[in-house]
Amino acid sequence: PHNIHFITSPSERVQLAVIGNRPSYIGFIPNPTEKVQLKAVEKRPECIFLLQKPAEKVQLTAVLKDPRYLSAIREPTEKVQLAAVQKNPECIRHIAEPTEKVQHMAVQRSPDIFRQIRQPEESVRLAAVQAKGEKSGTCPPRPKLYNWRLSETIR
């Protein structure tokens, strides 16, 4: 398996045999097929870091195992972004340009997360404010103050 980098164009069968023994060797395979990428990431999700352009299915597999693997993906598709943010809203900080839909998903799951969005859409800011208001219910009652001069409680 360790000689894979000496083969110019290994067949998919050879690639799969190598990955079956050592998933991390995917880094030595030039342009691995989607099937090979998937096998490596299914065995060891951290192999996503070794892939230049992982296929969407491979991205999803890694992110569903652990949303933090999103940080290894240069250009995650919206579907992958949504899957990661649905599992862990804080993953939005690893997305350079989250779509409005992804931003809304993150804010629905955790309203305070909008602070971690680089350029939140106006509708997302509004949704965050509304969500925070709904979670806290109505405004809390004003505290009673005691006026020492008048010796009475003021509302």
Q: Model regions: which residues?
A:
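Alpha-helical scaffold segments
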Residues: 1-155
